[in-house]
């Protein structure tokens, strides 16, 4: 269920502070975060944010079409390798 428009987008305070610092400094260094629940806001466009997927930090280059989505949508947590193949049926 989507968040109410009157509440506005949710972004963790520590992440918002890091984003503002990176924008001021013009830094291209990835910002590490564990906050998959934070929404991408227009101030993040052009930054690289390393989002934790449970094992490692996945670098996500934020572009304009990502605004309004959550960071966790771009760092997959599951590794699907396909269904098991029956070797006898393959012959």
Swiss-Prot record:
Q: Tell me one GO molecular function of this protein.
A: structural constituent of ribosome
The record's section on InterPro entries has: Ribosomal_uS19 (IPR002222), Ribosomal_uS19_bac-type (IPR005732), Ribosomal_uS19_CS (IPR020934), Ribosomal_uS19_SF (IPR023575)
Domain of life from the UniProt record = Bacteria
Q: Which Gene3D superfamilies match?
A: 30s Ribosomal Protein S19, Chain A
Key words of the record: Ribonucleoprotein, Ribosomal protein, RNA-binding, rRNA-binding
Q: Which GO terms describe its biological process?
A: ribosomal small subunit assembly; translation
Against Pfam families, the record matches this protein to: Ribosomal_S19 (PF00203)
Please give an example of a GO cellular component term from this record: small ribosomal subunit
The record's comment on protein family reads: Belongs to the universal ribosomal protein uS19 family.
Task: Give the protein's function.
Answer: Protein S19 forms a complex with S13 that binds strongly to the 16S ribosomal RNA.
* Protein's recorded name: Small ribosomal subunit protein uS19
Write down the species. Answer: Alcanivorax borkumensis (strain ATCC 700651 / DSM 11573 / NCIMB 13689 / SK2)
Its ancestry begins with: Bacteria, Pseudomonadati, Pseudomonadota, Gammaproteobacteria, Oceanospirillales
């Amino acid at each position: 269920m989507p968040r109410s428009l009157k509440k506005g987008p949710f972004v963790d305070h520590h992440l918002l502070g890091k984003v503002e610092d990176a924008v001021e400094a013009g830094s291209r260094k990835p910002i590490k975060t564990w906050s998959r629940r934070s929404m991408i806001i227009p101030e993040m466009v052009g930054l690289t944010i390393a989002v934790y997927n449970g094992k490692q930090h996945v670098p996500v280059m934020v572009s304009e079409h990502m605004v309004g989505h959550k960071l966790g949508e771009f760092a997959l947590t599951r590794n699907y390798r396909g269904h098991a193949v029956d070797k006898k049926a393959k012959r």
